[in-house]
Amino acid sequence: MPGITETSQVTGPVLAHVIVTEDPYDASERAFLSTDLYELLFEDYANGSKSGLTLISIQLMGSSLFNEFQTFKVYESEEQLPPNTVNLCNMGNIIDYSSDFTVDSGYVARVDSLVKLDTVIISVLPEVYSLASQASQHQLVDILGGNDQHTVIRQGDYNKDINGKISLCEPTDQGFLESTTKIIVVKENSLNLPLLDQSQDGSLNYEENVKMNLEHSISNYFSLNSLDPENQITTTGVEFSVKCLDSPISVRKTAKSISVAHDSEDESSPKLVEEDISNEDTLLYAFCKTTELAKIGCLSGDIVKMKSGQCQCTTFECNCESCPVQYRYIRIHAFTDPNTYEKGCIYLNPILSFNLNNPKIVKLCPISIPDKRFELQGFHFSKFIPLAKQVTIARVSSPVTLDRTLQTLFLTNLKTYFESGRKVLSKDQLIPIPVDTLLAKSIFSTYEKLGVDDSQFPTVIPEGKPDAIAWFKVTEVSGELADSASQQFIIDPLKTKMMQSGVVSCSPPKNSQHCNWANYLGCGQMFSFPNVSGVTTSTFEYAKTLRKLIKATIDPSRLVNLQTTVLLSSLSRAIGKSLLVHSLALECGVHLVEIDGYEVLNPSSESKTIGTIRGKLDRVVEGCTPLIVFIKHIEALTKKSEQQQKDSLAVKINELIDEYTAKPGVLFVASTNDSDNLSDELRAKFKFEIVLGVPSEQERTLIFKYLIDFDQKTTPKVTEGTRELSFAPRNDLSLSSLSLQSAGLTPRDLISIVENAKTLAVDRVESLAKHHNVSFENMVYSSGGYIKFTPEDVEKSINTARNKFSDSIGAPRIPNVKWEDVGGLDVVKDEILDTIDMPMKHPELFSNGIKKRSGILFYGPPGTGKTLLAKAIATNFALNFFSVKGPELLNMYIGESEANVRKVFQRARDAKPCVVFFDELDSVAPKRGNQGDSGGVMDRIVSQLLAELDGMSGGDGGDGVFVVGATNRPDLLDEALLRPGRFDKMLYLGVSDTHEKQSKIMEALSRKFHLHPSVDLDKVAESCPFTFTGADFYALCSDAMLNAMTRIANTVDEKIKRYNEELPEKSQVSTRWWFDNVATKEDIDVLVTLEDFDKSRKELVPSVSAEELDHYLRVRQNFEGGKEKKVVQENGQTEHFSNGSANNHITFGDEQVVEAIDENGNSIIA
């Protein structure tokens, strides 16, 4: 690596060599810089103009385990170090890897200051926790290094003094430990530490361990040196499982090919010669763990043979017919250690993998040429792969390659692809060319308006951000083939004649999680809609259905053309219908052409609309297979009309659908936000209709995981002198908590939440940097080089999204009413726990069809806390809350009222776990047949409500949805509502019948008051009658607070009056000035006294009279056992049964009859 030549001071990242050492005499962590690097980063310290503590932040390169910047103290510059070098001494987390550490470079940046840590959370094992938890805060700080004034604590480090892992640091991931830092010790069963090399007795002996591993590694590698003529390699190959890389891995270009040449003076002794391989085809680079190289018998950077069959067998020696074994020459590299890659696996780039038909297993063999090894002039691909004389490349027919507006850009990119190096190709190989479609269309439209011919388009085009792939296929390649099994040719742009002609039809490669070529080529990672099985349901069932339809349609083994047509619909916008089609098209390896109904619609002419559609689709449908024709917003073309006449445009579109789907392998998909507005003629044409709902809790968890992991996988690269701003979640961010709080939101809302959380995180870091007088850049380095968004940032973002879009999307919110706000209803609370807690904690008990009791009816006098209790249920169980009033459901149009009921329950299912609260239920579901409304709208609402309640009690559809009703008149309700399975648990909420309960209610209502020490709520309760409801006590406490405020205000007015009397008339002060300058704490502190409560109680009139309470008690007896029925038995005795629920069989002759006595004494015989 070249040394540093610049002399000006820089603060941005600088690429430098890294060495790791261990000092047996001084265990403190520290870093040393070479003299030139120290002068570059700390010029003001080097020339003596500044002194004090110096810090650096370094990100080690090459290993995925060191993807964050870590801050270290710099003791001094070291002249003995080579130029541009950092020496990390006693870095415990690095030393622990022993000989498995091969990182030798990293980006180094200057850090001027760190933040003082407020809190440090340490995770320890259970056997250590009992001892660590007993230590005082002062002892814990001393153990962590509190004696040192500038001890740097880093999140994720393992501290050997306390045998624990630093799990979390606040306010930043790295900072100074102070005596005031709060240390919290928590118990963890596993600390997720790196695998350490241990001696047989389990202790760590670093010196012996490093020495032993180093000697073993050196001897092992020299014995495997492919340049050693004495080494006779007899291996026939090693089998490896195949995995694909997620993103390109850069190979150091200083690693030139090591070749062997003879010394002119002594021909018998070979010497090493470096030859440039920077223009090689990197798609032939494969990677594995360092330990796997010993099995193959090669070094990192050697060329080996990779044999593979063309089947999907899991064993290499298969007996498949038409499966000739072929091999490729590849260059094998070892991953930088330490890493998390699997053993026994070879990692290929996805392009090479799908061109080999995605083999599951390959065999790697070292190249062995007996007696001619030292006649080779270099291990270049050109020594094994011949040069192609001529190559013919054809376009793969696809919507991208057939689009004229994109042609200039992808042909330019194709030329750049071959000019960038010596590519290696074989016949029938697919070549992907990334294209930025937005950039291409902009260039085309700009130059087309200027009247410029295609040949005059610019030859140098910006790279852009690719979002599509233009595929090309090698149809012919000619040259002197040295090995028929390889079929590889080198393409030299200066020597090989290249031709691009013709169009071929074939399917694109399948993009899967195991072979994600789209992400590898920079097109971004698309959400895959995984089908994960849960306790009762699976995630993204609609994606599973569409996936099956696509695979069945494109299956070449089917003899019958299915002519599949699918309509995707949703009740809400931004559900992800278009994303679903794009994702499954990539996954299944199908071409996709998409048009927007609003863009092709010509309201004035149906023929022009059809002509526009044909102009966009005819050529694509004719030339591409398999293909998905996707029209979004299809409702724009044919809307349902009130008239009973046929829609001529819908008829023509139906003819187009028949024409397109008549071709095998073509699938027609359309999407709409409201399928009911689609014309009946067109809707009837679709054989399958798939409804996309709002994501469930488990689905939202997967979406959040995708959004957050996606950001980490696309972390911007650090380049010398610059570092792009990147984001990452903090360790304590809980996806399950986020998914619970975001109930009812669409995927687009979830994306907005994550983006807003990033903005809030930036604002928080800027505010923190200003508060601690630290630069923003240093704050970012303190967090590992990322802007970390915290759970608080995401929760604020969720609340902002709900407040902003609650009216438009109807998003439910969790109310903030706790059990402490509800007083005197302990018995009712227990009943609620039995009804709601069991289905939520043990849903598996109801997965086999067992019906759960999900309906609760609160009834009783007004003001007894029915609505408050329903909100407390939602808060206590973290449920979303829907409140439904009767007038909200009524609509003047026939059928719309019932549709409103259906929408309420559908929204509840989308937002589950959820509570649907029907306030004043008697106005929503009165007895059927008693209303005189025209059309019987109330009867239909009740019938629809009964049907929805039956769906809620089932084991599948209503999982996580609970229905709560409240009414003052249960005698007016339809009897069908009160049967088991609907509102089957009736809870009476009456007035408090003891002074103790009354005291608990006032305690709950006044828990935020400042009460005078003389106030005894028990005494206040003893003076209250038993006719006071909860609302009356609320009025009592509110009036008492108002009396106290009035009393304080009058006292303040008197004080201001006396104060002004002592001043001259012209110097009178205002009330505001007096509060700002004269008032004391006693003047603004409102203390509620016993006199305030007495005055409020004397003025309060009960809202429910004693006679009304007696009426409600009679109603309660009616519903909870007051209807005792007498059953006459054969022996003449009478038994009492509640609600007539039990009858007795009586025998008269040979017949059995049932006789019951109703409450009026009448005999009933059935």
UniProtKB/Swiss-Prot annotation:
Q: Which SMART domains match?
A: AAA
When the coding gene is removed by deletion, what phenotypic consequences does the entry describe? Leads to a peroxisomal-deficient phenotype with the absence of peroxisomes and the accumulation of aberrant peroxisomal structures resembling 'membranous ghosts'.
Q: Which InterPro entries match?
A: AAA+_ATPase (IPR003593), AAA_ATPase_domain (IPR050168), ATPase_AAA_core (IPR003959), ATPase_AAA_CS (IPR003960), P-loop_NTPase (IPR027417), PEX6_4th_dom (IPR056995), RecA-like_PEX6_r2 (IPR047533)
Question: Keyword set for this entry?
Answer: ATP-binding, Hydrolase, Membrane, Nucleotide-binding, Peroxisome biogenesis
PROSITE patterns reported for this sequence: AAA
| GO terms for MF | ATP binding; ATP hydrolysis activity; protein transporter activity
Q: Where in the cell is it found?
A: Membrane
Q: What is its EC number?
A: 3.6.4.-
Task: Note the topology in the membrane.
Answer: Peripheral membrane protein
Matching Gene3D superfamilies: 1.10.8.60, P-loop containing nucleotide triphosphate hydrolases
Gene Ontology terms, cellular component aspect?
ATPase complex; cytosol; peroxisomal membrane; transporter complex
Reaction catalysis annotation: ATP + H2O = ADP + phosphate + H(+)
What the entry lists under CDD domains is as follows: RecA-like_PEX6_r2
Q: What is its main location?
A: membrane
User: What biological-process GO terms show up in the record?
Assistant: protein import into peroxisome matrix, receptor recycling; protein unfolding
This molecule's function is given as: Component of the PEX1-PEX6 AAA ATPase complex involved in peroxisome biosynthesis. The complex acts as a protein dislocase complex that mediates the ATP-dependent extraction of the PEX5 receptor from peroxisomal membranes, an essential step for PEX5 recycling. Specifically recognizes PEX5 monoubiquitinated at 'Cys-6', and pulls it out of the peroxisome lumen through the PEX2-PEX10-PEX12 retrotranslocation channel. Extraction by the PEX1-PEX6 AAA ATPase complex is accompanied by unfolding of the TPR repeats and release of bound cargo from PEX5.
Q: How does it assemble?
A: Interacts with PEX1; forming the PEX1-PEX6 AAA ATPase complex, which is composed of a heterohexamer formed by a trimer of PEX1-PEX6 dimers.
Membership in a protein family: Belongs to the AAA ATPase family.
Name of the featured protein: Peroxisomal ATPase PEX6
Instruction: Give the species this sequence originates from.
Output: Komagataella phaffii (strain GS115 / ATCC 20864)
Designated gene of the protein: PEX6
